[in-house]
């Protein structure tokens, strides 16, 4: 039985954000690197470093936290895994869901690589809906 790498990184980021950790370490694969590039480009994380330990590559993500008047920190990231190994969810470009009226993003795996919902609509291409981020 294989591991769900995308669910692992989503869970790691969500847990680190709820625990107010500044950095989180995830395994480095092509899929995780592409998803992290999207998170960095969209401003959900501050920084990414590649780290190598005994033949294994890791990505160290620096999370972004927002300060609030009442509490010192507010959970900033909300991530939800949509398509999973037991139930794949596919969508054409016209039916890609909009999260919070376009405020959030949908990460989609297409034949041209992993991209956001906006990029997929511009290129008029559909694919597997991996996760929602808002």
Curated annotation (Swiss-Prot):
Cellular component per GO, a single term: ribonucleoprotein complex
A Pfam family per the record: Ribosomal_S8
Plastid keyword on record: yes
InterPro entries reported for this sequence: Ribosomal_uS8 (IPR000630), Ribosomal_uS8_CS (IPR047863), Ribosomal_uS8_sf (IPR035987)
PROSITE patterns: RIBOSOMAL_S8
UniProt key word Ribosomal protein: yes
Subcellular location field: Plastid, Chloroplast
MF-aspect GO terms: rRNA binding; structural constituent of ribosome
GO biological process entries: translation
Keywords, alphabetical: Chloroplast, Plastid, Ribonucleoprotein, Ribosomal protein, RNA-binding, rRNA-binding
Gene3D superfamilies registered for this protein in UniProt: 3.30.1370.30, 3.30.1490.10
Family: Belongs to the universal ribosomal protein uS8 family.
Function: One of the primary rRNA binding proteins, it binds directly to 16S rRNA central domain where it helps coordinate assembly of the platform of the 30S subunit.
Quaternary assembly: Part of the 30S ribosomal subunit.
Name the record gives this protein: Small ribosomal subunit protein uS8c
Organism: Daucus carota
């Amino acid at each position: 039985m294989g591991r769900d790498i995308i669910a692992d990184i989503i869970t790691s980021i969500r847990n680190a954000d709820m625990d107010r950790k500044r950095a989180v370490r995830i395994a480095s694969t092509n899929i995780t690197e592409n998803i992290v590039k999207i998170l960095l480009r969209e401003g959900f994380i501050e920084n990414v470093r590649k780290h190598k330990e005994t033949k294994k590559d890791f990505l160290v993500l620096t999370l972004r936290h927002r300060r609030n008047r009442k509490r010192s920190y507010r959970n900033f990231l909300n991530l939800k895994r949509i398509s999973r190994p037991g139930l794949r969810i596919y969508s054409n470009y016209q039916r890609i869901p909009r999260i919070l009226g376009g405020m959030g993003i949908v990460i989609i795996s297409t034949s041209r690589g992993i991209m956001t919902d906006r990029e997929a609509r511009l290129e008029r291409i559909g694919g597997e809906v991996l996760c929602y981020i808002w």
